[in-house]
Amino acid sequence: MQTVNTQPHRIFRVLLPAVFSSLLLSSLTVSAASSSNDADKLYFGNNKYYLFNNVWGKDEIKGWQQTIFYNSPISMGWNWHWPSSTHSVKAYPSLVSGWHWTAGYTENSGLPIQLSSNKSITSNVTYSIKATGTYNAAYDIWFHTTDKANWDSSPTDELMIWLNDTNAGPAGDYIETVFLGDSSWNVFKGWINADNGGGWNVFSFVHTSGTNSASLNIRHFTDYLVQTKQWMSDEKYISSVEFGTEIFGGDGQIDITEWRVDVK
């Protein structure tokens, strides 16, 4: 791993509550659409999901471009141009189900769920990337102590599941390599400092060989955190499931041909 994100995208969402207002004005329900506007959302799947044009690190650089697009349930994604070689994340365009520094949760998502409920969250994703520079392809899963998370609710924990990466490395320290859900993962544990004096735990599972397709049961990972390592209480709530690309710099496009999240 060559680079570590020292200014993660999560801090942006805690520090700028004014963004909430702009998000309300830039949400679209689509059959087929695209947008290059900062923080735009394209809703689909009966509003269960949305594509989010998250460009939280844009102030670090000029001349950037990023566009999200949705054509159909088997044709969606985003492209980007971030002319930078610094070791900080510039953007996290993503697919979102549930909460994301918002007032509540997406419709029909089944979220939030308390870990003690023993429900399973399964997710499937298939994608291809053509890109240069530094980036990853990763799930981002957020936890709170409440089932009523709002736009100003700071999370207590974050679970990242890296399916692929190029020249990028997770925050925190390497702990061990584990086998979960038919795959091998390098486990990292760290802490995200927020400028408001708070912060949260971040747990990253990095696929040891990389994959462009995954069928995950999120409980495999939360059981490891709660039961095996006792790093997290089962009283916490899973608030959201995202999949996106943390982009440090470069040019590229991701095409997603399968995406779903189900709570059972």
UniProtKB/Swiss-Prot annotation:
By what name is this protein known?
Endoglucanase S
- What family does the entry list? Belongs to the glycosyl hydrolase 12 (cellulase H) family.
Top-level EC class, please?
A: hydrolase
Q: Name one GO molecular function term.
A: cellulase activity
Which UniProt keywords are given for this protein, alphabetically ordered?
Carbohydrate metabolism, Cellulose degradation, Glycosidase, Hydrolase, Polysaccharide degradation, Signal
Q: Which InterPro entries match?
A: ConA-like_dom_sf, GH11/12, GH12
This entry's Enzyme Commission designation comes to: 3.2.1.4
Q: Which organism is it from?
A: Pectobacterium parmentieri
Give the top-rank taxon of the lineage listed in the UniProt record for this protein: Bacteria
Whether Metal-binding counts among this entry's keywords is no
Q: Name one GO biological process term.
A: cellulose catabolic process
The reaction(s) catalysed by this protein are: Endohydrolysis of (1->4)-beta-D-glucosidic linkages in cellulose, lichenin and cereal beta-D-glucans
Signal peptide extent = 1-32
